[in-house]
Amino acid sequence: MTQRTLRGTNRRRIRVSGFRARMRTASGRQVLRRRRAKGRYRLAVS
């Protein structure tokens, strides 16, 4: 039987790649800027 090797947790997902996490750093804000420029419907996971 195969095993589930990846079990993501929502808390970590939000902490690492949520909107507020992106806003916290300069490079994160750059990510948001790029995604806005590209016209993404969702800027960050949250």
Swiss-Prot record:
Keywords: Ribonucleoprotein, Ribosomal protein. The gene is rpmH. Residues 31-46 have a biased composition (Basic residues). The keyword Lyase does not apply. GO terms for molecular function: structural constituent of ribosome. Residues 25-46 are annotated as: Disordered. GO terms for cellular component: ribonucleoprotein complex; ribosome. Belongs to the bacterial ribosomal protein bL34 family. GO terms for biological process: translation. It comes from the Bacteria. This is Large ribosomal subunit protein bL34. InterPro entries: Ribosomal_bL34. The keyword Zinc does not apply.
